[in-house]
Regions:
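A glycine- and Lys/Arg-enriched "phosphate-lid" helix/loop adjacent to the NTP-binding pocket
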Residues: 177-215, 219
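Hydrophobic anchor at the beta1->P-loop junction of P-loop NTPases
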Residues: 89
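ATP-dependent small-molecule kinase phosphotransfer cores
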Residues: 114-172
Length: 257
C-alpha cells in the first residue's frame, strides 16, 4: 500500500479476530488501507512516521555526538503531520465547501484543490453539460479519478463535490492522507441553482439532503456547522476558520499522532 501503489493491502484483518493493534511502517500514505481497516475494526493503528523521526533523532546523535531530548520526537512528528495532512471538505451542494476552501488557504499554508473545478478544466465541459451529454456514471468516474490523484498528495485543502461520498472508495482515498470535515449547512439555507444537475429545484435538494446526510455524518471526522449568511462578515469568517483549524489540530494530536 505504499505510494504509488496506494489502495493495496497485504492481508484482510477480518481474518485475525484476536488482533488488537496494527503497526504499518509505511508513512506515505499516512494511513494505508491496512491501517484504515484496522481502525474500522476497532484496533489501534500506527504508521511509520514517528519511527522515521526517531530514527533521524538517533542518527543525528550518533554522527554529530550530540544529545536530543526524546520529547522532540513527538514535537517533530506532530509538525510533520500538520504539514502533510490534507483538509478534506465534504457536504451538500451550496453548503460552502468551495468558498471555505478558498478562505482556509489564507489561514493555513496549504494549497486548495476543488475537484469539480479540476473536472471542468480538464474535460472542457461544465458539470451540467457533462451530465446532459454523458450521464451521472460518466461524471462519477471523472470524480473518482481526480480524487484518487489528489488524495495521494500532501498539504492540500480538497473541496469535493456533494456526491463524492456516494463512492466509499473516494472516502478511503481521501482519508489516507486527510482529515475529513463535514461542512453542515441546514436544508433551508441551501441554494437551488440551475448549474447543479441534481439539485435544480427545492424538492430535489430536499431528497438529496435526506439521502446523503447520513453519509456525511458517517464519513466526517468533524462536523462544522455553517449557517452563516452568504455575505459573511470577517468576524464570522474568522469564527468558521477557527472552528475548522482547532478541530483539525485536535484530531491530529489525539487520533493521528
Amino acid at each position: 500500500g505504499m505510494y504509488p501503489n496506494n489502495g493495496e493491502s497485504p492481508l484482510d484483518l477480518s481474518n485475525f479476530p484476536n488482533c488488537k493493534a496494527v503497526v504499518d511502517v509505511i508513512y506515505n500514505p499516512l494511513k494505508t488501507r491496512l491501517l484504515q481497516q484496522a481502525e474500522q475494526l476497532g484496533m489501534k493503528a500506527v504508521n511509520g512516521l514517528e519511527m522515521l523521526v526517531a530514527q533521524a533523532k538517533f542518527a543525528v546523535e550518533h554522527f554529530l555526538s550530540t544529545e536530543i531530548e526524546n520529547d522532540k520526537i513527538d514535537q517533530i512528528t506532530l509538525e510533520l503531520l500538520k504539514q502533510l495532512t490534507n483538509i478534506v471538505l465534504i457536504g451538500m451542494p451550496s453548503s460552502g465547501k468551495t468558498l471555505t476552501g478558498k478562505a482556509l488557504c489564507k489561514y493555513i499554508d496549504k494549497t486548495v484543490v476543488d475537484t469539480d473545478a479540476v473536472i471542468v478544466e480538464r474535460s472542457g465541459m461544465s458539470i451540467k453539460e457533462m451530465f446532459a451529454r454523458h450521464g451521472e456514471t460518466y461524471f462519477r468516474q471523472w470524480e473518482h479519478d481526480v480524487i484518487e490523484e489528489f488524495s495521494k498528495q500532501n498539504g492540500l485543502i480538497i473541496a469535493t463535490g456533494g456526491g463524492a461520498i456516494k463512492n466509499e472508495e473516494n472516502i478511503q482515498n481521501l482519508k489516507q492522507n486527510g482529515v475529513v470535515m463535514f461542512i453542515d449547512r441546514d436544508l433551508e439555507h441551501l441554494l437551488v441553482t440551475d448549474d447543479r444537475p441534481l439539485s435544480k429545484d427545492t424538492n430535489a435538494v430536499a431528497k438529496l439532503y435526506e439521502e446523503r446526510y447520513p453519509l456525511y455524518t458517517k464519513y466526517g471526522d468533524l462536523r462544522v456547522p455553517n449557517n452563516y449568511p452568504m455575505e459573511i462578515s470577517q468576524q464570522e469568517l474568522d469564527e468558521l476558520m477557527n472552528t475548522i483549524l482547532e478541530g483539525y489540530h485536535e484530531i491530529l494530536c489525539h487520533q493521528w499522532a
